[in-house]
Amino acid sequence: MLQKREKVLLLRTFQGRTLRIVREHYLRPSVPCNSPLCPQPAACRNDGKLLAAEVTHYVIPDWKVVQDYLEVLEFPELKGVIFMQTACQAVQHQRGRRQYNKLRNLLKDARHDCVLFANEFQQHCYLPREKGEAMEKWQTRSIYNSAVWYYHHCEDRMPIVMVTEDEEAIQKYGSETEGVFVISFKNYLDNFWPDLKAAHDLCDSILQSRRERETESQETHGKEYPEHLPLEVLEAGIKSGRYIQGILNVNKHRAQIEAFVRLHGASSKDSGLVSDILIHGSKARNRSIHGDVVVVEMLPKSEWKGRTAALGENDSDDKASGESPSEPMPTGRVVGILQKNWRDYVVTFPSKEEVQSQGKNAQKILVTPWDYRIPKIRISTQQAEALQDFRVVVRIDSWEATSVYPNGHFVRVLGRIGDLEGEIATILVENSISVVPFSEAQMCEMPVNTPENPWKVSPKEEQERKDLRTTHLVFSIDPKGCEDVDDTLSVRTLNNGNLELGVHIADVTHFVAPNSYIDVEARTRATTYYLADRRYDMLPSILSADLCSLLGGVDRYAVSVMWELDKTSYEIKKVWYGRTIIRSAYKLFYEAAQELLDGNFSIVDDIPELKALDKQSQQAKLEELVWAIGKLTDIARHIRAKRDRCGALELEGVEVRVQLDDKKNIRDLIPKQPLEVHETVAECMILANHWVAKKIWESFPHQALLRQHPPPHQEFFSELRECAKAKGFFIDTRSNKTLADSLDSANDPKDPLVNKLLRSMATQAMSNALYFSTGSCAEEEFHHYGLALDKYTHFTSPIRRYSDIVVHRLLMAAISKDKKMEIKENLFSNKNLEELCRHINNRNRAAQRSQKQSTELFQCMYFKDRDAETEERCIADGVIYSIRTNGVLVFIPRFGIKGAAYLKNKDSLVISCGPEGSSEWKPGSLQRSQNKIISTTAGGQSVTFHLFDHVTVRISVQASRCHSDTIRLEIVSNKPYMIPNTELCHQSSLLKSELVKEVTRSVEEAQLAQEVKGKVIQEEHQEYCQTKGRSLYTLLEEIRDLALLDVSDSCAM
């Protein structure tokens, strides 16, 4: 029977008054104890994760230990850990949401032997707070009382160790109850885990850092920064419009002096500002760190400053500032921090000389973070000399107003500086990517497929699914080496003469049950992480590379979308969704499919499924396959043409494939070449994603997971418009349709790279595409700007995207709505779905960053061991795509590299080019305008560099001990190194824009002809089916890396 208590809460209002709130608090005779020793498991309802049976004791940390030593408690070696509800709530209220979510994720993680015990809802454990009792004392008393009850509940069969930092509690409770021991956390590690050195080192580091904070708080220092305003003042200021809330973004090229606040939440609508707010200098930043949610006070207009237009020390991309410092922009200062974005940071210790120069107390060391945007961190350690050559992980503990730098503590060693595995580990830590192996509990949920016990289609599934194994020619088209084949395609002619197009996606949800251990793990990872030389899977390989991978010649479960199309206009007549059984006939690579599409049948020997056949059978199968690929391509052209009429964008990204040998040595860097078959596959995937989005929204209008791409801010197009103007083109950015048409017409027949770079600039101006719950925003906000679709989602890659798993469950619930009510019960509510979307969006950004950073790592490794002065491959043709006050930004097509090239060096010498084009450094000056920069020597010689000029550059590597190595570009001649862009010039006799216009006209004519029952123009149809030219289609997979046209449904390895 429930017992009712009254719980009194004292809350402070914005006006500073104390508000007394009384809430009902119900106590239960039993709550889940999650112990295998429970004498009444049915009464306790122990349905979730249980503690391990083989432990020698249970450990219960008090609230203070959970707050200060949570990262030690995360060690998987520490087993039998029971987190009391009282301790968890203390973390939530005193350490904020970030630390609390970290604790929640630890409790969910099947790899960690820890559970939550809701002691404040258990009638024998709950203790009311006594009058005048300090909160900290009540929390410790409550946790101890719960520990005693838990010991007796397990029938005194398992000793309990309560760890606390409260010396008074140790003295009071230490020997009060037999079987319940109360000791300090340090004492616990010394006695129970003496050989767990990493835990001891981390504990010592945290303890030392805490003691120093306490000592410093007692000392009087001058204030380095102003104090942050109280929370109630900040919230009232935001509400009144005096202050503005936003996310701090530090400019990595000028991390010491330049940061921007991107408006967040209501501030973005109420402030009236159309640009970011400049935060100039570290004082104005006021101890906020990149990614923090901050509150800003605007400065008077007379104090506004402008961005710097000069190249910084590590400029390497398009994100460098482009505005002149003479153009002031809204400027402010940080007055408070609403949410800290502190995380693990990879740092490097200073050299011996630097340590000596830091002062007499050598135990306090300033370490330099790998990320330029993070300030130096002061830590205390005696290992500085031993760790000078290593990358290590630290965490920030505090940043007081009296300290120039934040204080932190040492966590662990990653690896040696420059070592490949150490640098990869750095990228993973910097992006908060965990790559630990799947746990035993998770693997126990997996199906078995071994030679002794092969997996088979079950009779039940054969009855419930549509069987396509003998009726449909199903095949996949993927990159070479792809193992996780998410999608397959089919096309066939129906008895009524119409066509049937099918997209068949791996049925991952059949094997991954909602809220199972593997489902929780996949949700946490959210995506498969693809690096330049490896990948980290979201799902175990038994699923990702075997039973869910739609490999050739084996039976697989799929979720299919199949459309009936008009045989001439390809108009969709009807659509079917459902679960199927397929057997893929071919596992084609993109290159082989393109060769077949182009009529090169000699590629047959590279297709294993055809190679083993006799000539007659081979010819028949080949004709069937070629027809299917050709028909799919023709359908895809018409689908794309229809989207183009609505304003779909074809943008440009840079993707480089790292070619490795068997020993993982880098053989070459190869920019990915677009093929028309890429577009064919992508268009089919876009079609499936669009139709599934419509279906799940119709069925669940308030809790469907869709993907939106908001229109970009017009001011972000300024550089694109100016650059196009330099070549005589006008870019109309009023809508996606006008932008697409303008980019299609901005072609320089002498240099195709001009259009490529303009599209790349358009990509940089775009906002990010994001997942969202349909119950969280208005329908007019669902639109996908880049794809020109009113509703869009991700359905086609459930092996490597958790969003697709959610969408599959929604689709199954939609088509089974009246049949299986239990399916609906496993769907997320709007609130929970929106929280999940934020998590997935965050993990997607991490995946994109890590992929980009790993590619840059391998680019540097490729050039690092080469002599830039003599090696031919270190000299390349480059195109200037942006002008700065002291140099230019250059794109190198051969290697897909973008970077800065200085025209003025550190000695203030400027570049001078002779009649042959060769360069040298001389005294002089630079004069910059919008579209060109002139270098004039003291002797009067001048050289002009224009936008889109081709120059010869030397590629070398700028080594860095504390940060990642970077590519260094040096202009060695103002002449092209070779015929500009030879490799790309002759790719196609038809530009993509021309092809789409022709196909659009074909569709319109076919529709008109059908209306008047006229004759279809067969000549044009034949032209499109038989074209051998490669389109200039830019891979949608590339755009995924830029979080825009993210329809990539192929793997990167």
Swiss-Prot record:
Subcellular location: Cytoplasm
E.C. code: 3.1.13.1
Location of the CSD1 domain: 236-310
Superkingdom of origin organism: Eukaryota
Main enzyme class: hydrolase
Annotated SMART domains: RNB (SM00955)
Residues with the Phosphoserine modification: 989
GO cellular component, one term: ciliary basal body
A GO BP annotation: RNA processing
Region Disordered, annotated ranges: 306-332
Keyword match Repeat: no
Pfam families from the UniProt entry: OB_Dis3, RNB, Rrp44_CSD1, Rrp44_S1
Catalyzed chemical reaction(s): Exonucleolytic cleavage in the 3'- to 5'-direction to yield nucleoside 5'-phosphates
Domain CSD2: 365-431
Disulfide bonds: none
Cofactor requirements of the protein: Mg(2+)
Keywords: Cytoplasm, Exonuclease, Exosome, Hydrolase, Magnesium, Nuclease, Phosphoprotein, RNA-binding
Listed GO MF terms: 3'-5'-RNA exonuclease activity; enzyme binding; exoribonuclease II activity; RNA binding
Predominant location: cytoplasm
Every RNB domain range: 465-816
Role played: Catalytic component of the RNA exosome complex which has 3'->5' exoribonuclease activity and participates in a multitude of cellular RNA processing and degradation events. In the cytoplasm, the RNA exosome complex is involved in general mRNA turnover and specifically degrades inherently unstable mRNAs containing AU-rich elements (AREs) within their 3' untranslated regions, and in RNA surveillance pathways, preventing translation of aberrant mRNAs. It seems to be involved in degradation of histone mRNA.
Family listed: Belongs to the RNR ribonuclease family.
Subunit structure: Component of the RNA exosome complex. The catalytically inactive RNA exosome core (Exo-9) complex is believed to associate with catalytic subunits EXOSC10, and DIS3 or DIS3L in cytoplasmic- and nuclear-specific RNA exosome complex forms.
Protein name: DIS3-like exonuclease 1
Source organism of this protein record: Mus musculus (Mouse)
